[in-house]
Curated annotation (Swiss-Prot):
Known EC number: 2.7.7.91
Keywords associated with the record: Antibiotic biosynthesis, GTP-binding, Magnesium, Metal-binding, Nucleotide-binding, Nucleotidyltransferase, Transferase
Presence of the UniProt keyword GTP-binding in the record: yes
Protein name (database record): Valienol-1-phosphate guanylyltransferase
Catalytic activity, reaction form: valienol 1-phosphate + GTP + H(+) = GDP-valienol + diphosphate
Family annotation (InterPro entries): ADP-Glc_PPase, NTP_transferase_dom, Nucleotide-diphossugar_trans
Pfam (any one): NTP_transferase
Cofactor(s) in the UniProt record: Mg(2+)
Domain of life: Bacteria
Length: 373
């Protein structure tokens, strides 16, 4: 896949996640008992045979880069995370963290398109050559995917842009970017979070641009009265400009973890009789030395993902319990997510909740649909 520059946008602060997002970077929110949100997109890039992915972030970027450098770089031969203007410093520190980073000299970005503009010298380069395509990804989407087929179709069609999309229930379309296509698979409409949806297709938020075309539209939009956003500005401008834009349907599981209730619902999906993702489909980056098991039934646990080192003296039902957690004597945990190292006190009864690392509890809206036991 020479010429493809993978770019990972990781600017979220996690404000809509409530206590779960407080004090932590949203990309590093744990997920599935195995990993963090950002690890899914990184693993997908690695799975697709691309040799690196450029991280674009600004909110507590040192903290995020340090984490990813230790977790990912040097662990997979021939693959690494590129930190753009900071990359040379990290390359000189394999397996450890640099003492100091270069001073930030570029302005703060106001949106996803701004991130591409301010770091253009890194975005549009692939190794020592100009990139031919830019693969734009986000850090809070949960899915297992190989981008190879999408890249091949994009190149064969000579499209200026290929957008991923998925079919969902129309009542949820207003939460996403709505897309429509003609009989030839060409994009005819793109509307971010429509009030009155006319389609059941939504933008799955990863896309592949022809690099030269993307750069041209970014330069055209620069200095105008725009929202500095890929979905609200760049894609609509390309559509209005008559560019060839094709769609690529995502038929497998994909989830945008935008709120704590979506986060909780996504965990419930892992426990179904036909899980949305198998444990083996998820990156293993949180305490990778500890085995995990999907336990259908047994003493003190039913239909749950439980790490092997969990100290359980209570009852775990339809829950995901991370490494290092402890469930106290006669405690009952039902339909919950228990984060790494969390303690559930003796005699506690919890349902439809997230137990944070410090033991505090964040309630979630209960779902009508029951998890298969």
């Amino acid at each position: 896949m020479d010429g493809v520059r993978a770019v990972l946008l990781a600017g979220g602060e996690g404000r809509r996640m409530g206590p779960l997002g407080r004090g932590r970077l949203k990309p590093l929110v744990p997920f599935g008992g195995t990993s963090r949100l950002i690890d899914f997109s990184i693993a997908n890039v690695h799975r697709s045979g691309l040799r690196d992915v450029l991280l674009l972030s600004q909110y507590e970027e040192r903290r995020l880069m340090d984490d990813l450098h230790l977790v990912w770089n040097g662990r997979h031969r021939g693959f690494r995370i590129d930190f753009g203007p900071y990359d040379a410093v990290y390359r000189r520190s394999p397996g450890k963290l640099p003492e100091q980073l270069p001073e930030r000299i570029w302005p703060l970005e106001r949106g996803t398109a701004d991130a591409l503009l301010t770091k253009a010298e890194y975005v549009f380069r692939q190794g020592d050559a100009e990139a031919s395509e830019i693969l734009v990804l986000h850090a809070d989407h949960v899915y297992r995917f190989d981008y190879g087929d999408m890249i091949r179709e994009h190149r064969a069609s000579k499209a200026a842009l290929t957008v991923s999309y998925q079919r969902i229930e129309r009542r949820y379309v207003h939460l996403f970017g709505m897309v429509e296509f003609d009989g030839d698979g060409l994009l005819t409409a793109f509307e971010e979070k429509p009030d009155d949806p006319t389609s059941d297709l939504v933008f799955a938020a990863f896309c592949l641009f022809d690099a030269a075309t993307l750069r041209r539209y970014l330069e055209q939009l620069r200095g105008t009265d725009w929202q500095h956003d890929i979905s609200r500005d760049v894609i609509p401008a390309m559509l209005a400009g008559g560019e060839l834009i094709r769609g690529y349907e995502v038929k497998s599981y994909w989830e945008d973890i935008g709120t704590v209730d979506r986060y909780h619902r996504a965990h419930r999906g892992l426990l179904r009789a036909d899980p949305t993702l198998a444990l083996s489909d998820m990156p293993l980056t949180v305490a990778p030395e500890v085995p995990r098991h999907l336990v259908p039934g047994g003493p003190g646990r039913r239909a749950s993902v439980v790490a092997a080192d969990v100290a359980n003296e209570g009852e775990i039902v339809s829950s995901v319990v991370y490494p290092g957690a402890r469930i106290g004597v006669d405690a009952h945990v039902v339909d919950c997510v228990v984060l790494p190292g969390a303690r559930v006190p003796d005699g506690t009864h919890l349902a439809s909740a997230i137990v944070l690392e410090d033991g505090s509890v964040q309630q979630c809206e209960a779902e009508r649909e029951e998890v298969a036991l």
